[in-house]
Amino acid sequence: MKFVQIVDFETDRFDEMQAVAEEADKRMAGRAGGPTHRLVLRDRNKPGHVLVVIEFDSYEDAMSNSNDPETGKFAQQMAALCTRPPSFTDCDVLDMTEFK
């Protein structure tokens, strides 16, 4: 079953976060069990509020990714750029539909 983690945070340093994420993407490219998709959303009514939806093939892949030291380093770098600590919501994907 596919698994999604939603990361909810606030920042006034989004450009710096993007640079950190791009560098991490390069380091972790091609790694087995990593995320399959990422969607980054900015609240139109509260621009510093950001949600990141990260999809994995399974819960087990997500936990393996979470336990990787490289992921821990990335998470610490990102948290340092937040104006409030991130919160995490773990979700099993029950249905997914594309409307194209």
PLM features: what roles do these ranges have?
Residues 1-72, 76, 81-100:
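Short S/T/G/P-rich N-terminal loop/turn motif that feeds into the first structured element of a domain
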